[in-house]
Curated annotation (Swiss-Prot):
The lineage of its organism: Bacteria, Bacillati, Bacillota, Bacilli, Lactobacillales. This is Small ribosomal subunit protein uS17. One of its GO terms (cellular component) is cytosolic small ribosomal subunit. NCBIfam families: PRK05610.1, uS17_bact. The keyword 4Fe-4S does not apply. The gene is rpsQ.
Amino acid sequence: MERNNRKVLVGRVVSDKMDKTITVVVETKRNHPVYGKRINYSKKYKAHDENNVAKEGDIVRIMETRPLSATKRFRLVEVVEEAVII
């Protein structure tokens, strides 16, 4: 899975409406530089999903790759955990 020094992120799929593209939100915690309080940060990434296997709510692992479109810089590596459908 390690290819050069590419970023590997784990996040939750929030949209799978596009063809071969998913939107993944990655949540991180960081300390405030002055006050030291833990703050939640979240960032959305568009990732390439060649076979449309990821569904909304899934936990996925994405890896940095060459630019695939104007906004896509990541590709789907694996679905870590499938969403529970009630």
